[in-house]
Amino acid sequence: MSEKYIVTWDMLQIHTRKLANRLVKKIHSWNGIIAVSRGGLVPSALLARELGLRCVDTVCIESYNYDCLKENRKIIKKAEGNGEKIIVIDDLVDTGGTAKIIRKLYPKACFVTIFAKPMGRSLVDNYIIDIPQNVWIEQPWDMSISYIPPLIQNYKIK
């Protein structure tokens, strides 16, 4: 995947608020949130704030190793229950591998993501941004802001 979609902290918050706006209409339906670790951790905090929910748990599924999608996903930890009155959130649905596990673990949950790629899109109940399948998403927690020297410093003035 050579093309990248860069997500800033501001854009993540804007997109998560859009998602919250869709979910707030059913606010009496929700008892809590399950964040899919690690991608859903930051969005879950933002979503919990916007919806006034205090109960946030995690399901930990190893899907990626840095920038490489793993074939065999491993459930490290799961939240209890079948997902009734729960929002499960991840940052992205990609090929659908993790989403299929989430659907089996929490069949009654409302599963949402910020970003959705074509192969996994049908597995989520709601999402905000369409992303082409061949595009890699760079999330703000995976990047750092660093100083870039001016170009002139590459040239010695004699």
UniProtKB/Swiss-Prot annotation:
Reported function: Purine salvage pathway enzyme that catalyzes the transfer of the ribosyl-5-phosphate group from 5-phospho-alpha-D-ribose 1-diphosphate (PRPP) to the N9 position of the 6-oxopurines guanine and xanthine to form the corresponding ribonucleotides GMP (guanosine 5'-monophosphate) and XMP (xanthosine 5'-monophosphate), with the release of PPi. To a lesser extent, also acts on hypoxanthine.
Keyword annotations from UniProtKB, A to Z: Cell inner membrane, Cell membrane, Glycosyltransferase, Magnesium, Membrane, Metal-binding, Purine salvage, Transferase
Compartment list: Cell inner membrane
Residue numbers binding 5-phospho-alpha-D-ribose 1-diphosphate: R38, G39, D90, D91, L92, V93, D94, T95, G96, G97, T98
Reactions this protein catalyses: GMP + diphosphate = guanine + 5-phospho-alpha-D-ribose 1-diphosphate; XMP + diphosphate = xanthine + 5-phospho-alpha-D-ribose 1-diphosphate; IMP + diphosphate = hypoxanthine + 5-phospho-alpha-D-ribose 1-diphosphate
Protein name: Xanthine-guanine phosphoribosyltransferase
EC number annotated for this UniProt entry: 2.4.2.-, 2.4.2.22
Superkingdom as given in the UniProt entry: Bacteria
PANTHER family referenced in this protein's UniProt entry, alphabetically: XANTHINE PHOSPHORIBOSYLTRANSFERASE (PTHR39563), XANTHINE-GUANINE PHOSPHORIBOSYLTRANSFERASE (PTHR39563:SF1)
Oligomer status and interactors: Homotetramer.
KW Cell membrane (keyword) present: yes
Pfam families, alphabetized: Pribosyltran (PF00156)
NCBIfam families per record: PRK09177.1
Stored InterPro entries: PRibTrfase_dom, PRTase-like, Xanthine_Guanine_PRibTrfase
Family: Belongs to the purine/pyrimidine phosphoribosyltransferase family. XGPT subfamily.
Residues bound to guanine: D94, I137
Name of encoding gene: gpt
Binding locations of xanthine: D94, I137
PROSITE patterns associated with the record: PUR_PYR_PR_TRANSFER
UniProt main location, coarse: membrane
Membrane topology: Peripheral membrane protein
Gene Ontology molecular-function annotations: guanine phosphoribosyltransferase activity; hypoxanthine phosphoribosyltransferase activity; magnesium ion binding; xanthine phosphoribosyltransferase activity
Cofactor: Mg(2+)
Keyword Glycosyltransferase: yes
Source species of the chain: Buchnera aphidicola subsp. Acyrthosiphon pisum (strain APS)
Residues that, per the record, bind Mg(2+): D91
